[in-house]
Each structure stands twice: as structure tokens, then as C-alpha cells.
């Protein structure tokens, strides 16, 4: 499947027989069904999204190759309460130099890191392969009370090559991951590839603030991160700004934070004005009923 212009499609039917799907160009292909006799490949600008369903969160394939300038995304089945992460089972998978693999979790469940997202017979990680960890866009809260330590992301029943035992590589993070954590790494421990990350100490949003208003918005988001109502618009907004920063859209993040700060100031002004109106009404009523003290 190749496209010279931007295109996107979703397939949720049945993959019959056996075969190979090769995604390239500007095509984005969603697959919501699996077949252990199929080989998948994505390269040269293509995006392949593997996304299970509520009824079938596990997808099975024979082999997957994430090629140069290709993006492989393993995305949770949804962002609702209890929606499972997608689990991928393959005979072998190869992450080539120049590829990007995105692991997208649903944090709106009790144990988002309870099981690996990928299990394979063999895993090959070439030098220069990139990895990104993020969450569903609809997520607005993350239980981030401590460092992430030895979270199993991938597991091999056979062997892992290209990443030596004990060796680690830096991973990119975005969304709520980047709000609460920093210094994410993937490392090999025997037949597992583990995630480790430390709680973020510096204000993520400050790096994109280039005006007084955007700096005020950055401070607002940073201070509010642990006291947000998951259903609030501010929580959704924080997730979006974090993603913009990760994508390099610092000017967009700055404008968004400035708007947030301005909205907050306006809201406070409105609240003060309404409170003053109420107080003046109470004074008027008291004066009407009881008169005015002659001393005044």
C-alpha cells in the first residue's frame, strides 16, 4: 500500500489466507485484525497503526519490519475507563535504522503497565532505531507517584539481537509521559526490553515559554499537574501542549500557554466582578431594610 499524497485507511475485516502488507509513501494504514500467516512492513514515510478492539485486544502476525523512515504504532484499543492496551504477538520483529516505533498506552485503567505490549519469538533492534512512548489523546491523568522501574515493554520467547544484555538506548516521550517523567531509556535484561524513567523535576512547559503570558501559562500547568480533575478541560489541554513540545512546535505551545494564562486572568476578573456585584446588592438590601448609620 503506497500513496504519493496523504491518505489514511482502516481495515477491521478478516485477513484471509497468507500474504504480505507493505506500507510506504504518505499512507497511514490502521489494522484492527490479525493473522499469524501475514508479514507486515512499513517504510519510506508510511505509518502502520496496529490497534486491537475491545473484543480482540491481541493481534497476531508472522513478522513485522519497521523500516527506514517508517512509523510503526502499537495503540491501545481506546481511552475509556478499562480499555485495554493492544497486545502484539509475532514470530519475529525487526526495528531497522531510521524507523520509529510508538507505544501508545491507555492510562485510564488500573494497571497500564501490567503486561508487555509486544511478545515475539525474536526481536532485532538495529542501531539508529527510534522509540516513542505516549498515551491516548483522550487521557488526562496519570498515576505518577514514583519512578518507572523495569517496566516490561517487550519480551522475546527466543532471542534479542542488536541490543546487548544490559545495554540501553534513549527513548522519546510525549503527552502525559513527558509531563510527569524524564530521562526515559529502554534496556535489555535477558529476553526482556525494559522501560526506566525518573520523575520529572523541571517544568516541562517552561522550555516553550517565550513571553510573560506564556511563562504564566507554563507555571499554571506545572503547578496544576498533580491536582487536576481528569475530566477537566485543563487536563486535556496539558496533554496537548506536552505533545506540541515533543513534536517541536514550540511556538504553538507558547501561544496555547499564553491563551491559557489569559483565560485564567479573565476568569478571575469575571469572578471578582460577579462577587463585587453580589456584595453591592447585599449592601443595598441592608440599607433599604435598616437604614444608614448617621455616623457615616
Locate the predicted segments by residue:
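GD-rich hexapeptide-repeat beta-solenoids
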Residues: 1-13
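Bulky hydrophobic/aromatic "packing anchor" residues in well-ordered structure
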Residues: 11, 15, 101-103, 195
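Extracellular beta-strand/loop-rich repeat segments of large surface/secreted proteins
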Residues: 17, 21-25, 30, 35-39, ...
Amino acid at each position: 500500500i503506497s500513496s504519493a499524497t496523504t491518505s489514511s485507511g482502516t481495515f477491521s475485516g478478516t485477513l484471509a489466507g497468507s500474504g504480505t502488507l507493505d506500507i510506504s509513501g504518505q499512507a497511514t494504514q490502521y489494522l484492527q485484525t490479525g493473522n499469524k500467516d501475514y508479514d507486515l512492513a512499513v517504510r519510506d514515510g508510511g505509518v502502520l497503526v496496529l490497534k486491537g478492539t475491545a473484543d480482540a485486544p491481541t493481534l497476531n502476525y508472522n513478522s513485522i519490519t519497521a523500516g527506514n523512515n517508517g512509523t510503526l504504532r502499537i495503540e491501545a484499543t481506546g481511552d475509556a475507563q478499562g480499555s485495554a492496551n493492544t497486545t502484539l504477538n509475532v514470530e519475529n520483529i525487526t526495528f531497522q535504522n531510521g524507523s520509529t516505533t510508538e507505544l501508545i498506552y491507555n492510562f485510564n485503567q488500573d494497571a497500564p503497565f501490567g503486561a508487555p505490549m509486544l511478545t515475539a519469538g525474536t526481536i532485532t533492534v538495529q542501531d539508529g532505531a527510534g522509540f516513542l512512548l505516549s498515551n491516548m489523546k483522550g487521557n488526562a491523568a496519570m498515576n505518577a507517584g514514583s519512578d518507572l522501574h523495569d517496566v516490561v515493554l517487550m519480551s522475546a520467547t527466543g532471542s534479542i539481537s542488536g541490543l546487548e544484555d544490559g545495554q540501553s538506548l534513549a527513548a522519546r516521550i510525549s503527552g502525559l509521559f513527558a509531563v510527569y517523567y524524564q530521562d526515559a531509556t529502554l534496556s535489555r535484561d535477558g529476553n526482556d526490553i525494559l522501560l526506566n524513567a525518573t520523575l520529572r523535576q523541571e517544568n516541562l512547559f517552561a522550555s516553550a515559554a517565550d513571553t510573560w503570558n506564556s511563562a504564566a501559562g507554563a507555571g499554571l500547568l506545572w503547578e496544576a499537574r498533580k491536582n487536576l480533575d481528569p475530566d477537566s478541560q485543563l487536563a486535556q489541554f496539558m496533554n496537548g501542549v506536552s505533545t506540541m513540545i515533543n513534536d517541536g512546535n514550540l511556538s504553538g505551545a507558547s501561544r496555547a500557554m499564553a491563551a491559557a494564562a489569559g483565560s485564567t486572568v479573565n476568569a478571575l476578573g469575571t469572578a471578582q466582578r460577579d462577587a463585587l456585584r453580589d456584595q453591592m446588592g447585599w449592601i443595598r438590601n441592608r440599607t433599604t431594610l435598616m437604614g444608614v448609620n448617621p455616623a457615616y
